[in-house]
């Protein structure tokens, strides 16, 4: 039975006039659902009064178990109990195999590249597992609120790529949820703290969850949230702290690292319990089998220090990307259960020179903020005015051009939603089709970027090279999902694609791509210039050869032809090398020695066009 909500006079939520919408934090370790009740955003409890739902799903032959009971069965039934499924969202089968023994499951492949977990209930994809968690949250919300939901705002890490976001939307659809918006977790946290109404200036959102780390720098101005930069590590979280403590136990106890799935789960649960105990205690007794030892907070801090340092390095990079200084940041919001670790809080305070905001439960803050946004998007009037959320894309989007070059159409950290168009042309005479290769990344060469999709534009009118104009439009919606369209402007023929890869980036790939873009920036620029010079030279060679085939014998004498042939041979040889300056100079020389030939061809074309026409016809 739904509980009756009693409000103070003048604060009634007018239930019959409000549309029911919720915010959902679909987390790696835990998940929550929240909603606005009596004007306040709060997490919704289950029948036992618990607001946190462990992100654990256990499959039986005839039923599915979700939450705390499933989590407790993980050691006894590791092959049928799925934990931390968020880490598998948008991944390929080859990606999860690289994780090796970290995942005690049997994986099988499907028709898509998506990994399936082999259970007694049959193969289960990460999308299906996530959907089972979302179904429980949806049912909890509808029972508590006493009605059917019009939709939900689901939060995702700011660093989630296109495939991971799409997988999240697919899971929601499977769970019977209408997704009003995918909202970046850092932005949701800022909304929860009411920073949209009370703050002006720069805010850092430090989000360390079970499986991912995000850092976002936001500028708040009059209710407008502008995300200046995002960063993080998609392979850093509380799970990694657990694995580190588990490694310490194995080493200290002299155990074999080759454990069966049940023993592995049991070990990780022991490590997690020790980590959580050290949040309040200075020392904890750790027992595993017949072995036991003391683990001090000081020793634990030393174990996790490399990971804490990695998070701070990402913070400094995000601050640099946003064009501000650390001391300019006015507030730091802590998000995610792993920010309860004292060393994490101390390190963040030291880095930013101020104590972080921790008043709202870090496990609940994201869902609370998402619920506020959901209520607004559902069409309910929000006290205190509207807020505008301006999120950004984490990596540049572009396409392949001749020479294997990456041409950026939308740079990283561009505010979304966004649409950008750029004009391109054909490379060869008579070209009637063009392959559009959609890429993501920061490097200059396509071999160093990630391929998202390919599609072909056909029906381009046959023209000389460079005459056709193809407009390529990239559009990223508010959920961070990309669609690309190409249109030939003269004929109107067009083609488009919604980019929906079957799997996403591997662990840490986004962070690695950003790191590489800085590390190899100089080399990339040199390589790009070389490729461009090679393409220009090749284009000139083909154009000259085409002209020679048509008019060479008629308009050139033997000596002129020999000079041009020699210059062409020299340029053709230089293109095979890596001396960009020499290619550029030889291209200029070939262009100069063919100037007279080009002028004669132009004269011949004009004479042919005017042949048989009188002056009066021309004046008309």
Swiss-Prot record:
<dbReference type="GO" id="GO:0016226">
    <property type="term" value="P:iron-sulfur cluster assembly"/>
</dbReference>
<dbReference type="InterPro" id="IPR042039">
    <property type="entry name" value="HscA_NBD"/>
</dbReference>
<dbReference type="InterPro" id="IPR029047">
    <property type="entry name" value="HSP70_peptide-bd_sf"/>
</dbReference>
<dbReference type="InterPro" id="IPR029048">
    <property type="entry name" value="HSP70_C_sf"/>
</dbReference>
<dbReference type="Pfam" id="PF00012">
    <property type="entry name" value="HSP70"/>
</dbReference>
<dbReference type="InterPro" id="IPR013126">
    <property type="entry name" value="Hsp_70_fam"/>
</dbReference>
<dbReference type="InterPro" id="IPR018181">
    <property type="entry name" value="Heat_shock_70_CS"/>
</dbReference>
<keyword id="KW-0143">Chaperone</keyword>
<protein>
    <recommendedName>
        <fullName>Chaperone protein HscA homolog</fullName>
    </recommendedName>
</protein>
<dbReference type="GO" id="GO:0016887">
    <property type="term" value="F:ATP hydrolysis activity"/>
</dbReference>
<keyword id="KW-0067">ATP-binding</keyword>
<dbReference type="InterPro" id="IPR043129">
    <property type="entry name" value="ATPase_NBD"/>
</dbReference>
<comment type="similarity">
    <text>Belongs to the heat shock protein 70 family.</text>
</comment>
<comment type="function">
    <text>Chaperone involved in the maturation of iron-sulfur cluster-containing proteins. Has a low intrinsic ATPase activity which is markedly stimulated by HscB.</text>
</comment>
<dbReference type="GO" id="GO:0005524">
    <property type="term" value="F:ATP binding"/>
</dbReference>
<dbReference type="GO" id="GO:0051082">
    <property type="term" value="F:unfolded protein binding"/>
</dbReference>
<keyword id="KW-0547">Nucleotide-binding</keyword>
<dbReference type="InterPro" id="IPR010236">
    <property type="entry name" value="ISC_FeS_clus_asmbl_HscA"/>
</dbReference>
<dbReference type="GO" id="GO:0140662">
    <property type="term" value="F:ATP-dependent protein folding chaperone"/>
</dbReference>
């Amino acid at each position: 039975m739904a509980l009756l909500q009693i409000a103070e006079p003048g604060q009634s939520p007018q239930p019959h006039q409000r549309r029911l919408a919720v915010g959902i934090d679909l987390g790696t370790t835990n998940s929550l659902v929240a909603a606005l009740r009596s004007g306040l955003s709060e997490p919704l409890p289950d029948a036992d009064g618990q607001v946190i739902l462990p992100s654990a799903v256990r499959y039986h032959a005839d039923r599915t178990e979700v939450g705390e009971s499933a989590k407790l069965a993980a050691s006894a039934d590791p092959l049928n109990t799925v934990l931390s499924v968020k880490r598998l969202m948008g991944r390929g089968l080859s990606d999860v195999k690289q994780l090796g023994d970290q995942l005690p499951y049997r994986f099988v492949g499907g028709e898509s590249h998506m990994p399936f977990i082999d259970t007694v209930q049959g193969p289960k994809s990460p999308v299906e597992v996530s959907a089972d968690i979302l179904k429980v949250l949806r049912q909890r919300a509808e029972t508590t609120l006493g009605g059917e939901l019009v939709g939900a705002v689901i939060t995702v890490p700011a660093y989630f790529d296109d495939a991971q976001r799409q997988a999240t939307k697919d899971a929601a659809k499977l769970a019977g949820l209408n997704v009003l918006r995918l909202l970046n977790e850092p932005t949701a946290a800022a909304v929860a703290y009411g920073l949209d109404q009370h703050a002006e200036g720069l805010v850092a959102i430090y989000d360390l969850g079970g499986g991912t780390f995000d850092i976002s720098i936001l500028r708040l101005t009059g209710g407008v949230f502008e995300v200046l930069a995002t960063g993080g590590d998609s392979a850093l979280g509380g799970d990694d702290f657990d694995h580190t403590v588990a490694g310490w136990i194995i080493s200290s106890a002299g155990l074999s690292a080759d454990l069966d799935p049940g023993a592995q789960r049991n070990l990780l649960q022991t490590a997690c319990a020790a980590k959580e105990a050290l949040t309040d205690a200075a020392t904890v007794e750790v027992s595993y089998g017949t072995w036991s030892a003391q683990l001090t907070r000081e020793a634990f801090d030393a174990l996790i220090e490399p990971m804490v340092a990695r998070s701070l390095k990402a913070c400094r990079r995000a601050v640099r990307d946003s064009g501000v200084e650390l001391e300019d940041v006015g507030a730091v919001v802590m998000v995610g259960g792993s920010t309860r670790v004292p060393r994490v809080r101390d390190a963040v305070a030291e880095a930013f020179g101020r104590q972080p905001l921790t008043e709202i439960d870090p496990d609940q803050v994201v869902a609370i903020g998402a619920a506020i946004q959901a209520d607004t998007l559902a069409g309910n009037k929000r006290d205190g005015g509207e807020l505008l959320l301006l999120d950004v894309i984490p990596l540049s989007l572009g396409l392949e051009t001749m020479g294997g070059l990456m041409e950026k159409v939308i740079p990283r950290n561009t505010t979304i939603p966004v649409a950008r168009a750029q004009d391109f042309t054909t490379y060869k005479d008579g070209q009637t089709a063009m392959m559009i290769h959609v890429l993501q990344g920061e490097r200059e060469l396509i071999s160093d970027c990630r391929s998202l999709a390919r599609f072909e534009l056909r029906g381009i009118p046959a023209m000389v090279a460079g005459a056709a104009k193809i407009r390529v439009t990239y559009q990223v919606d508010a959920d961070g999902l990309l669609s690309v369209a190409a249109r030939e402007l003269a004929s109107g023929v067009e083609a488009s694609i919604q980019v929906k890869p079957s799997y996403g980036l591997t662990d840490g790939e986004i962070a690695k791509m950003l790191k590489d873009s800085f590390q190899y920036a100089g080399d990339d620029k040199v390589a790009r210039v070389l490729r461009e010079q090679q393409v220009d030279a090749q284009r000139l060679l083909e154009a000259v050869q085409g002209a020679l085939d048509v008019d060479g014998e008629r308009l050139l004498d033997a000596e002129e032809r020999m000079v041009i042939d020699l210059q062409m041979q020299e340029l053709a040889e230089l293109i095979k090398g890596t001396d960009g300056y020499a290619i550029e100079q030889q291209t200029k020389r070939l262009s100069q020695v063919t100037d007279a030939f080009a002028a004669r061809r132009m004269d011949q074309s004009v004479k042919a066009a005017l042949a048989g026409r009188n002056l009066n016809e021309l004046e008309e």
